[in-house]
Amino acid sequence: MGSLVLPLSAVFCLVARLASGSPIMGLEQSPLEEDMPFFDDIFTEQDGIDFNTLLQSMKDEFLKTLNLSDIPPQDTGRVDPPEYMLELYNKFATDRTSMPSANIIRSFKNEDLFSQPVSFNGIRKYPLLFNVSIPHHEEVVMAELRLYTLVQRDRLMYDGVDRKIIIFEVLESADGSEDERSMLVLVSTEIYGTNSEWETFDITDATRRWQKSGPSTHQLEIHIESRQNQAEDTGRGQLEIDMSAQNKHDPLLVVFSDDQSGDKEQKEELNELISHEQDLDLGTDGFFGGPDEEALLQMRSNMIDDSTARIRRNAKGNYCKKTPLYIDFKEIGWDSWIIAPPGYEAYECRGVCNYPLAEHLTPTKHAIIQALVHLKNSQKASKACCVPTKLDPISILYLDKGVVTYKFKYEGMAVSECGCR
């Protein structure tokens, strides 16, 4: 059986209709013409198509755009996304004039939940562990380590706390011996803390190196040391990193990347054949062997006044057009891994494509010819189909193997324009 590929908008259109308790009007209640092809008609007309196989194919197509092999397993408890990721999503969802520095943003949490910070010779050491996995076909634009610093000071005596922060990558020896491990400096900087707040450190180069080595665990060690000698620093205050387990201030590695594998969808131009629709001599005997009497009457009726016919047909309200279709992720059982939005307006294309095809429906040459053949012999070819011709992206925040991921442009999710194909 040949592969059957449908756009994502069609996937959600079908899923929404199949979902239990769906408020969407059933096909039998449709005010459209009875001969308008919907999914049920399409399936029965194509021999050898198994419905369950089709659903699996559509699900695979949806997940492929997210670089997922399958729907992430549902955990017993819902994962609380980092506040930073929620802020990113809300920022770009509400402000359409702004856009992130990359299309894909992943957040990796600290995996070392048991090690405690230690102090030695005036240096406070914090161990961190990140399990980083970034597909090779993506380009890492930027990576930053976000640490929440806790400042404790006497506000009456001191303005702030002056500290030096060094971020090391712990490199294990070939035999795994801790005695032979080395420390690579990733960041060395000075900060002057006056209030508890987030501090951001650029570790882009290290993250690009990690990407090349494939999915693996990487150990970091944060050193905080005073810029004063120990005697002068006594009583001035403290600056620490918030390492509390299950805390909204968990250390966070945020990676910004772009997908380099997909080609941008090209806009289909209006075919010049539209301008020649009225010039076709439909009454010649050379056209498909000559029309029968019923088809001839229909063609003559269409050609009497093309403009008036278009207006009259459009006034009926059943011509091809975009109509509302709201997708609720909870209703289709995907709210366990799609964090935001809870749903969105996907729209759908409904209506009929009668000859002559209106210019605003941007028909292809194939659609125009198919409409002509249907007009001549409805048993030989069906009408052209009312389908999405332009799709818009949406932004989505979701879980990918436990990693909270934000995708700014998740292409092909909402219908922008409809046409005849």
Swiss-Prot record:
Propeptide residues per the UniProt entry: 22-313
Keyword tags: Cell adhesion, Cleavage on pair of basic residues, Cytokine, Developmental protein, Disulfide bond, Glycoprotein, Growth factor, Secreted, Signal
A GO CC annotation given for this chain: extracellular space
Compartment list: Secreted
Disulfide bonds: 320-386, 349-418, 353-420
Glycosylation sites: 67, 131
Alphabetized Pfam families for the sequence: TGF_beta, TGFb_propeptide
GO molecular-function terms, A-Z: cytokine activity; growth factor activity; hormone activity; receptor serine/threonine kinase binding; telethonin binding
CDD domains in UniProt: TGF_beta_BMP10
BP term (GO), one: adult heart development
Membrane-spanning intervals of the chain: none
UniProt signal peptide: 1-21
Misc: Does not appear to contribute to radiation susceptibility in the LEC strain.
The protein's assembly and partners: Homodimer; disulfide-linked. Interacts with FBN1 (via N-terminal domain) and FBN2. Interacts with ENG.
Protein's job: Required for maintaining the proliferative activity of embryonic cardiomyocytes by preventing premature activation of the negative cell cycle regulator CDKN1C/p57KIP and maintaining the required expression levels of cardiogenic factors such as MEF2C and NKX2-5. Acts as a ligand for ACVRL1/ALK1, BMPR1A/ALK3 and BMPR1B/ALK6, leading to activation of SMAD1, SMAD5 and SMAD8 transcription factors. Inhibits endothelial cell migration and growth. May reduce cell migration and cell matrix adhesion in breast cancer cell lines.
Family per similarity comment: Belongs to the TGF-beta family.
The protein's name: Bone morphogenetic protein 10
Classification lineage: Eukaryota, Metazoa, Chordata, Craniata, Vertebrata
Gene: Bmp10
